[in-house]
């Protein structure tokens, strides 16, 4: 991956968004072919974007029917949206006649209207194997009536399989999302001092995100300090941070639909941590890099997961150490923690993981750390570069390429 600017320029190759859309669509077609599907009905907004490049209006909770995408075997995608004129005007890669009204699938009548429009476009494919990514109780009753000759299968599994390995342009988007997140982190750190509220720090990070073009934040985002770090509380409050507090920061920016996501824990103020605090941070830190070290071809996601919540290596996790894939959805397969046997898969180059262990004890402190890492052929590609709090790292891990290079405090 290259660490270049965000703009399109004529003097070097950067992200080719047309190529990215074409390659994503081909991966979806390949996943459909592997599953033997004739038609794919997609209602998750992030996956509508994956198939069509349509950026939808977003809210704090999912709104079923905001947009949809239909992918017929051997055909071009259909985009279903409330923003018909916008899409037809600004998305020339989707034929105008393939932009349809939004899918009103919250009622039986709305579902029938949507189905009739789809059948008029795809013909006999509506009588084959149809993958659907969201299957509410209502849809489970209405769709079989609308497509009486069809066989329904899990469309979410199909689209997740398509997204599992990132293209080169997707990897570049992910890196830029991480770079924006790092910038937000730095702005936050520049203002981390006794007397500031958790929510004030988060607002500073969000402002930097927005200034650099972030579309959204990876979640409500977390600045968690003092007693809220152990037991761990995963949201931001109005607490005033005090000198010596451990401060967990878990934030992520969004670049063109791809989500940055990583976590660090810092000591507030010009003060050294205790030996107990250093030991807990080291537990989380070692677990993080030992798990990241497994992200190579030839391993499985279970090899990553075995380090998380391990009774010997990560005994103070409270069961909170975890990890997940990421892309156009900040939480998507492959998973790495609490795996059932059927969820264990071989790692392939280009898979992406967010790995986030925790270690903490009430009265001492809590320590959540997180990196994003791509699976590599020979070694993991850990592209989260923000260093850890030097005061909390006793022994620098060989895979940590930043911490220790600017150590300012004694062990």
Place the predicted regions along the sequence by residue.
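Active-site neighborhoods and metal-handling regions in enzymes and metal-associated proteins
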Residues: 1-411
